[in-house]
């Protein structure tokens, strides 16, 4: 990026999307990690000297000056590989920014293998006007711009859960951006039909199971269903997924059926809770509990945001929520699995890949149509992951975005990663002890479906005849 482009982009951001400033003394919570909002003031020692060029002796500096100087030093970086200007990061604590940047960020992408449109007459009306217009002359979608934000937010949830499982919560992108485990996770979400959690897989499964036409916006429940089913089909992910029903109830008996095997061993399980916390806005009685959900060490974030515009929320401070925004269109992320990928995934084509030679689409089903220059030779599939730092940088950002809780849409998807039974007990205690009205309810057992009779109830029915009536 040249200087003119960088300056132009900075001017546009300043006027139309200004970066938030660190204007609160409340602690910052990011997926269970607490950060102080201000770095400690600089305290001189007898051996300290004035930094070069300041012209101010240490004894004459105020706490405010030290804090400003520290903030400037924290953000004094060279331009990032993804083209972001470090000046926009403001005076946020560097440890918080490092953690924020380490979260995997999925956005709109363009130029990928086409996803064929549905031939169902209802499909067109299910798309937004913008999506219809930008794909008017195309038989398929080569970009998910305009309809894929909830899918991308769902990918963020799943990708960060897998990253924490493989690298731990304390791994930082800045220290080892090309770590093998990191590249392996990124490859799972490549914009390619062969990637197990690609946009193609989500759209295909949404059409087959959730009644979502290609190009139609997903809701939280459809995203959760796709995550659960796609993970179930890809055992190499090493994860189980539990999805709550129509409400915010988590049933312990059903959860343990998924999380605990026959030997009593607990497997890492992603809990997805789809809920609605109000009509048009989040009801204030839920505010404290929603903030507390991001303070739990099991939190993997929240997918939601505004009507038909989903974000991935990872942090909170006072009544503000910080998020990763998927509404930036970038070139496709190529599929580059490592050599340790399972032979079954490489050798055996999925249903989606097997249908990739077809160009027809009926009802709500979808077909992937590869172009000639996008087909990877079989010999390339098993090569070690070769993502460049520039490609990896498109999946991370230090650019903070913030939204007041009163501006958030009440429909959302909450995510928690439970790695053991002790972890589950800790999480259960946490959701039950929040202030205000809880956003998640843990019940011992799932109630029997309505209309299902209790066993033995028919034997307790007493018959009456006319002679027995008084």
Give, region by region, the residue ranges found by the protein language model.
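Stable alpha-helical elements in mature extracytoplasmic
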Residues: 153-154, 223
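Cysteine-dependent deubiquitinase/ubiquitin-like isopeptidase catalytic cores across multiple families
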Residues: 2-143, 147, 159-162, 166-470
């Amino acid at each position: 990026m040249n200087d003119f482009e960088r300056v132009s982009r900075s001017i546009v951001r300043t006027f139309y999307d200004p970066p938030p400033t660190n204007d609160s003394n409340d602690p910052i919570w990011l997926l269970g990690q607490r950060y102080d909002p201000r770095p400690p003031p600089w305290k001189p020692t007898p051996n300290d000297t004035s930094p070069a060029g300041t012209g101010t002796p240490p004894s004459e500096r105020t706490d405010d000056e030290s804090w400003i100087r520290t903030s400037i030093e924290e953000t004094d970086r060279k331009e990032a590989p993804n083209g972001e200007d470090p000046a926009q990061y403001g005076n946020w604590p560097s440890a918080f920014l490092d953690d924020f940047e380490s979260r995997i960020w999925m956005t709109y992408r363009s130029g990928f293998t086409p996803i064929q449109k549905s031939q169902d007459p209802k499909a067109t009306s299910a798309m937004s006007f913008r999506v219809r217009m930008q794909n008017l002359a195309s038989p398929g979608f080569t970009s998910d711009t305009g309809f894929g934000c909830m899918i991308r937010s769902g990918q963020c949830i799943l990708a960060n859960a897998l990253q924490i499982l493989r690298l731990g919560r304390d791994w930082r992108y800045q220290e080892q951006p090309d770590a093998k485990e990191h590249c392996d996770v990124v490859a799972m979400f490549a914009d390619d039909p062969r990637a197990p959690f690609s946009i193609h897989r989500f759209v295909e499964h949404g059409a087959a199971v959730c009644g979502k036409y290609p190009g139609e916006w997903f809701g939280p429940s459809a995203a959760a269903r796709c995550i659960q089913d796609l993970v179930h089909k890809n055992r190499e992910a090493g994860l189980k997924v539990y999805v709550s029903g129509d409400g915010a109830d988590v049933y312990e008996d059903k959860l343990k059926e998924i999380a605990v095997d026959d030997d009593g061993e607990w497997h890492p399980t992603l809990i997805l809770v789809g809920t609605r916390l109000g009509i048009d806005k989040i009801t204030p009685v839920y505010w404290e509990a929603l903030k507390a959900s991001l303070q739990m060490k099991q939190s993997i974030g929240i997918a939601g945001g505004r009507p038909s515009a989903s974000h991935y929320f990872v942090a909170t401070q006072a009544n503000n929520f910080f998020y990763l925004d998927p509404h930036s269109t970038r070139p496709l992320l190529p599929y580059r699995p490592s050599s340790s990928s399972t032979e079954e995934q490489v050798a055996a084509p999925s249903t989606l890949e097997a249908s990739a030679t077809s160009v027809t689409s009926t009802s709500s089903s979808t077909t992937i149509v590869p172009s000639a220059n996008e087909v990877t030779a079989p010999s390339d599939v098993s090569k070690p992951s070769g993502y460049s730092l520039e490609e990896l940088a498109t999946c991370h950002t230090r650019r903070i975005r913030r939204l007041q809780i009163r501006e958030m849409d009440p429909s959302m998807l909450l995510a928690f990663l439970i790695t053991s039974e002790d972890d589950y007990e800790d999480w259960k205690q946490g959701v039950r002890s929040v202030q205000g009205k809880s956003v998640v309810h843990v019940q011992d057992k799932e109630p029997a479906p309505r209309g299902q009779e209790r066993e033995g109830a028919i034997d307790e029915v007493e018959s009456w005849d006319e002679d027995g009536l008084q």
